Amino acid sequence: MRLSPIPLALAAALCLTPAWAQPGPASPTPSPRATPAGQVLTLEQALATAYKRSPLLAAARNEAASSEGQLTQAGVIPNPSIEVGIDDNRRTTRTTTTTLSMPVELGGKRAARVKAAGLARDIAQRDLSSARADLRAAVIAAFFDVAVAQETVRVSQGAVEIAQNALRLAERRVAAGKAPPLESSKARVELANSRIEARAADSALQAARRKLGQLWGAPQPDFAQVGADLDTLPRREAIDDLRAALATSPRMEAGRLSVEMGRAQLEVEKSKRYPDITLSAGVARDNEQGRNKAQFGVAIPLPLFDRNQGNVYSATMQSYKAQDMYRELESRLTADLLQSVSQFDLAANSAREYRATVLPGAAEAYDSARKGFEAGKVSFLEVLDAQRTLSQGNIGYLNVLASAYQASADIDRILGR
């Protein structure tokens, strides 16, 4: 795992001279907590595990598979029926009739059903792609949440060390009679606050680890830590390229297919206006006359009252609704995409500003304040203020870093990548 600039800022503060202010090699960073090498989780491993074990993705796969069965069922023809009737219970005068009847669908019902079922299958496939993209985005966001939380723990531990050093300096000055006891009291309060923040950071890390593990159905995290490169910010494409990618995203394709599905369902209902006929053929055995009689027939329902007019109207309105929903989907996804792009740009630019100005300046200010305090040139209050500025800068950098990765994951989710 590559190290971010945060531990460098802490190391610079602890080593009295900021790393950004000298041309030599960077100061050594604090070592991460000991973890078995086999337990370090990479992003590729997290994605592969989620694709394999996610209950939600498995449910989406089953939903897509079920649509194949619906397509098969839509193409079958009605079953024939056989009817046997006996007239008269006396054998000598009995007539036994056996009839085979076959329904015949008219009006293109079967073709309309097959088309609608095919569109439903295509929509299910796009929904599966969207579910996979949602899972990928969630894993990436949760993965970097863990990575940032790990870094936050290291930063908070470094802040505790800084507060401990400040307390030792204050106690030495108080013991030497160079400062009032109030300074050591303030230093103890600052150390207590740093420890509280460190415990909160550790709790946030455990919550982030659980959230990541839950994405593949693990009630407890089955990894110790993640390995992520926090030095490299994700990149985004140009707006025009993102808009073009949105137009072909699974959600937009599913929306267009839903419009076609609405029209196909309307055709299904229209086809039901034409009644199906039933053809029959059979034989009647007349025992009294000792001969067989062939029988043929056709049954035609008369559409005098029920012409499926209500369902046709309902399907028409549903078709209009699908068109309206598609327009709403296009507008919403475009707005979401632009919002995520704006959030990403803000976070990425802020992260660069933190790296270039805030973190080096905060470390240098703390170093100068501590040296001045040791020399008796500045007050302890100024040291505490510089210490808080350094800590807030570190935490602020991690927050914008997490926002950048979250916004990047949101962009990928919207585009269905």
PLM region spans:
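Amphipathic alpha-helical coiled-coil segments
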Residues: 59-71, 131, 135-156, 165-168, ...
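Small/polar-residue-enriched beta-strand and adjacent coil segments characteristic
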Residues: 40-43, 80-131, 253-330, 340-343, ...
